[in-house]
Amino acid sequence: MTQSIIALDIGSKTIGLAYSSGVIASSLDTIRFEEYNFDQGLRQLESYLKKYNPTIIVVGYPKNMNNTIGERAEMVDYVIEMFLDMYKNFNKDQIIRIDERRTTKIAKNILIQANLTREKQKKYKDSLAAQLILELYLESRKL
C-alpha cells in the first residue's frame, strides 16, 4: 500500500518541503514568509496538502546536540500546534517528529559539493533538508 507523506523542515523564515509515496523521498519546494510569521507560511502549505493529500506529515525536530529540547524545537512544537488548529482534517497522530540534527548542514555540504552558486544553495537548502528528514523517516520504518 502506498502512502502519501510530506516532510517539513520548519525554520523562522522558510518551510522546506519534501514528498514520498512511501518509497523514495523527493524534495519539492521551499515556502518563504516574513520572519516568524508562521500563519503566512502555513497558509502557503495548503496547495501542497491538496495536491499530495498526505496521510502523514513528517516534521524535522531540531533537538540540541545533547538531546535536550531547546528554543528551535519549541518553535517547531508551536508551529505544529498552529498547523493542527489551521488544518482540522489532520490529528496529532499523523504528525511524526524526526530528529533532524545536522540535516541542514548536510544539505548545505551536498549543495556546495554540487558546485551550485550561493543563490541556488539558498534556494534548495531547505527542501533538500526536508528530503533528508523524510529519508531518515523512511529508513526508520525499515528497521
Curated annotation (Swiss-Prot):
GO terms for biological process: rRNA 5'-end processing. Keywords: Cytoplasm, Hydrolase, Nuclease, Ribosome biogenesis. GO terms for cellular component: cytosol. It comes from the Bacteria. It is found in: Cytoplasm. It holds the Pfam family RuvX. SMART domains: YqgFc. GO terms for molecular function: nuclease activity. InterPro entries: RNaseH-like_sf, YqgF, YqgF/RNaseH-like_dom, YqgF/RNaseH-like_dom_sf. Its EC number is 3.1.-.-. PANTHER family: POLYNUCLEOTIDYL TRANSFERASE, RIBONUCLEASE H-LIKE SUPERFAMILY PROTEIN. NCBIfam families: RNAse_H_YqgF (TIGR00250). HAMAP family: Nuclease_YqgF. Could be a nuclease involved in processing of the 5'-end of pre-16S rRNA. Belongs to the YqgF nuclease family. This is Putative pre-16S rRNA nuclease. It comes from Mycoplasma mycoides subsp. mycoides SC (strain CCUG 32753 / NCTC 10114 / PG1).
